UniProtKB/Swiss-Prot annotation:
L-methionine binds at residues 57, 103, 258, 289. This is S-adenosylmethionine synthase. Residues 103-113 are annotated as: Flexible loop. Binds 2 divalent ions per subunit. Binds 1 potassium ion per subunit. One of its GO terms (biological process) is S-adenosylmethionine biosynthetic process. Pathway: Amino-acid biosynthesis; S-adenosyl-L-methionine biosynthesis; S-adenosyl-L-methionine from L-methionine: step 1/1. Catalyzes the formation of S-adenosylmethionine (AdoMet) from methionine and ATP. The overall synthetic reaction is composed of two sequential steps, AdoMet formation and the subsequent tripolyphosphate hydrolysis which occurs prior to release of AdoMet from the enzyme. Belongs to the AdoMet synthase family. K(+) binds at residue 44. It comes from Mycolicibacterium vanbaalenii (strain DSM 7251 / JCM 13017 / BCRC 16820 / KCTC 9966 / NRRL B-24157 / PYR-1). SUPFAM superfamilies: S-adenosylmethionine synthetase. PANTHER family: S-ADENOSYLMETHIONINE SYNTHETASE (PTHR11964). Homotetramer; dimer of dimers. It is found in: Cytoplasm.
Length: 402
């Protein structure tokens, strides 16, 4: 083991069993929100050999979308690429079991009529929506990349997206949907200086030779292609160690290889371990769940702080009590990278951003079917889709506030 400071992050493709589950849960959410934007949704999915189980709690007026959940499930599996038993899973023929009930009225009471309205007599309409649960959520941004994400997770996601791209466009038509990437970067302080290791494991058709075909073609069409496009100022990518399918074979994959569950890739979904995580998963949850909406808001806050030049990197924590609208806590950490007093940064955040759940939903326009595309390749720093929490619309307000 080298004495170098090495940090590692991983990503997975949309065909990974856990990501199939995230995709199904978010596809169900989007279908319900499209017909009834006020739908309350908490949907969990399990996949295993030949079976999909979708469970949870839903309150909605979207009767047609609710009745069509089975078809929504099948369509998403087929879109991912599991369309034949040769791939270990087939969206057309797999069993789909639905076990969904209504949202608890006790929870609904706290969301629909917050403590501020119910007990304290608040008149502001935004005080009427309480947090759907207690919890703590983190947001992070760093000037490592143009998208203000830590480099290791940003690079791992690019590799995963490229792996899926060359499978779907037929460049490497022997690839199958399941896959993982991992990137290890050497740091000098907090500056990424050298790409040390790339690990890429991909499901493939039987009979594909690793040394003569798979490894060199993955290097050419995925790894080299991504590194050529990267163009990072401080990172030396000239001689990384590359490990392709280091077990030697990856034919059996997807739900036949491993069971999958919604919400089991929360580090992949966020900052690759570079920043802290409050523990709550995202997929399958409507925005009344602060696990999701407040984590998005914290990314929005952090990204605007860095883009405003107030710090080179920032981590923001918010916390809620179930049934309360106002956060119970806000914490800002700039790691000594700030250009102004951190106390002023925290005060500016409080002035510029309204972190009550109803305000987050309003300001980010979250009652829309925008969630299925986030189920793979990360919820933050996306360069391939537009997401409201990635917008830099508060930079001038923050500058003025400090």
């Amino acid at each position: 083991m080298s004495d170098a400071r090495l940090f590692t992050s991983e990503s997975v493709t949309e065909g990974h069993p856990d990501k199939i589950c995230d995709a199904i849960s978010d596809s169900v959410l989007d279908a319900l929100l499209a017909d009834d934007p006020k739908s309350r949704v908490a949907v969990e999915t399990l996949v295993t050999t030949g079976q999909v189980h979708v469970v949870g709690e839903v309150t909605t007026t979207a009767k047609a979308a609710f009745a069509d959940i089975t078809n929504t499930v099948r369509e998403r599996i087929l879109e991912i690429g599991y369309d034949h038993s040769d791939k270990g899973f087939d969206g057309l023929t797999c069993g789909v079991n639905i076990g969904i009930g209504k949202q608890s009225p006790d929870i609904a009471q706290g969301v629909d009529t917050a403590h501020e309205t119910r007990v304290e007599g608040a008149a502001d309409p935004l005080d009427s929506q309480g947090a759907g649960d207690q919890g703590l959520m983190f947001g992070y941004a760093i000037a490592d990349t143009p998208e203000l994400m830590p480099l290791p997770i940003a690079l791992a996601h690019r590799l995963s997206r490229k792996l899926t791209e060359v499978r779907k466009n037929g460049t490497l038509d022997y690839l199958r949907p399941d896959g993982k990437t991992q990137v290890t970067v050497q740091y000098d302080g907090t500056t990424p200086v050298r790409l040390d290791t790339v690990v890429l494991s991909t499901q493939h058709a039987d009979g594909i030779d690793l040394e003569s075909q798979l490894a060199p073609e993955i290097k050419q069409h995925v790894i080299d292609a991504v590194l050529t496009e990267l163009g990072h100022d401080t990172l030396d990518t000239s001689a990384p160690r590359i490990l392709v399918n280091p077990t030697g074979k990856f034919v059996l994959g997807g739900p036949m290889g491993d069971a999958g569950l919604t919400g089991r890739k929360i580090i992949v979904d966020t900052y690759g371990g570079w920043a802290r995580h409050g523990g709550g998963a995202f997929s399958g949850k409507d925005p009344s769940k602060v696990d999701r909406s407040a984590a998005y808001a914290m990314r929005w806050v952090a990204k605007n702080v860095v883009a405003a030049g107030l710090a080179q990197r920032v981590e923001v924590q918010v916390a809620y009590a179930i049934g309360k609208a106002a956060p119970v806590g806000l914490f800002v950490e700039t790691f000594g990278s700030e250009t102004v007093d951190p106390v002023k940064i925290q005060k500016a955040i409080g002035e510029v951003f309204d972190l009550r759940p109803g305000a987050i939903v309003r300001d980010l326009d979250l009652l829309r079917p925008i969630y299925a595309p986030t189920a793979a390749y990360g919820h933050f720093g996306r360069t391939d889709i537009e997401l409201p929490w990635e917008q830099l619309d508060k930079v001038d307000d923050l500058k003025a506030a400090v």
